[in-house]
Regions:
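Asp-based, Mg2+/Mn2+-dependent phosphohydrolase catalytic module
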Residues: 12-115
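Conserved phosphate-coupling serine/threonine residues in phosphotransfer and NTP-handling enzymes
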Residues: 4
């Protein structure tokens, strides 16, 4: 499931560009969040309830460190997708980050092979 502050049409373009369009089952976008974006904790809780997610088996990827904090607090694994600029912004959120990558597609491929 893609959990995004963007709209579905934009996300589909990005996923297609990254050749990840067939990896995800659904998109939980800003409209489905009732325009209450991440990192609002209630939005994460609604996502978990909407899909009956087992947080112990769920992973949240995000390029914004602050969006990983509520996910970690709820028990999800977290992956920081970064570039050099974002590395400077981590400021203490690293305790809430389980993994880091600068290549989402590569990370997903490795994860899927090993799990």
């Amino acid at each position: 499931i893609v959990f995004t502050n963007a709209d579905t049409s934009y996300v589909k373009k990005i996923l297609k560009n990254l050749d990840l369009i067939n990896i995800f089952d659904d998109i939980y976008d800003i409209e489905r969040m009732n325009f209450l974006p991440k990192p609002n904790l209630q939005t994460y809780k609604k996502l978990i309830a909407a899909y009956n997610l087992d947080v112990k088996k769920a992973i949240l990827f995000d390029d914004i460190p602050q969006n990983l904090i509520p996910a970690a607090d709820l028990g999800l694994k977290t992956v920081q997708v970064y570039n050099k600029k974002l590395l400077k912004e981590l400021n203490g959120t690293s305790k809430k980050i389980d993994y880091m990558t600068n290549n989402l597609k590569e990370w997903l491929q490795k994860w899927m092979l090993n799990n």
